[in-house]
């Protein structure tokens, strides 16, 4: 325990040195520390001022706080879209709770609320996709088209038979790669014809981005984490999240330069060996 304010430079510096000492005892080369934004900013300043002392220290911003702040970004973008009224009138949340979760004040409730809205929109989107395939698509054979439509309908229907639902979902996943181009074409055409479809399709993309980031944190997927963070940064900038856009963007740029440096170094070594 360190008897001091967690946001003081001396406390942050002592914490970083203690972690380094622990890594030396364990004979590990690098030490990884995760902070929230307020402490992360001070830790990075210390590392920038003492680059040689903390060259083997990796400072990460906490994924929970990034996700929580991104929830507030989503709420700000779609604050007048009717999502709050939808959550209240459907009886899912009360007035005060719905208002707070859209401001990013509650992580679990916020993720659940956006998951529910996302699920409802995806069901409507798949129904519209099925109708579009029946009305306009002539590229698929009739038999194959009917199979795809029946699988979509099976997955949409509520069923207590878990085995049949898993079977239908598995068959649908097998055919999804072939449907992907058609679905992208459908979304493009529908977005051009309807601004409302384009608006809610953007909501689907943003919530899926949040879910990808959460999945990366839970699974420890570094590539998915980098991809999700890279797509999050423009939203932080657009919604005036100055500190998050600055420090998350800076961290991402440093990681990219590090990977480029490592690739160039490997190429130089292989060239010398040849």
Model-identified regions with their sequence ranges:
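Long, low-complexity intrinsically disordered regions enriched in Ser/Thr/Asp/Glu with frequent Gly/Pro
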Residues: 1-274
């Amino acid at each position: 325990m360190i008897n001091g304010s967690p946001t003081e430079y001396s406390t942050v510096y002592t914490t970083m040195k203690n972690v380094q000492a622990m890594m030396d005892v364990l004979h590990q080369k690098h030490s990884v520390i995760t902070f929230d934004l307020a402490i992360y900013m001070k830790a990075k300043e210390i590392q920038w001022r003492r680059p040689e002392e903390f060259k083997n220290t990796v400072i990460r911003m906490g994924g929970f706080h990034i996700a929580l702040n991104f929830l507030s970004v989503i709420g700000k973008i779609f604050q007048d879209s009717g999502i709050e009224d939808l959550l209240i009138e459907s009886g899912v949340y009360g007035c005060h709770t719905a208002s707070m979760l859209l401001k990013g004040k509650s992580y679990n409730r916020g993720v659940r609320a956006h998951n529910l809205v996302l699920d409802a929109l995806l069901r409507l989107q798949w129904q519209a996709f099925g109708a579009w395939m029946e009305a306009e698509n002539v590229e698929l054979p009739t038999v194959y088209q009917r199979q795809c439509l029946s699988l979509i309908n099976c997955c949409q229907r509520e069923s207590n038979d878990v085995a049949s639902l898993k079977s239908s979902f598995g068959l649908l996943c097998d055919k999804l790669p072939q449907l992907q181009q058609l679905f992208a074409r459908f979304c493009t055409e529908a977005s051009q014809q309807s601004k409302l479809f384009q608006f809610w399709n953007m909501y689907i993309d943003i919530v899926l981005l949040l879910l990808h980031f959460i999945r990366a944190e839970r699974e420890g997927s570094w590539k998915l984490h980098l991809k999700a963070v890279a797509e999050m940064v423009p939203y932080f900038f657009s919604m005036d999240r100055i500190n998050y856009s600055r420090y998350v963007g800076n961290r991402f740029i440093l990681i990219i330069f590090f990977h480029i440096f490592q690739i160039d170094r490997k190429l130089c070594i292989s060239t010398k060996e040849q």
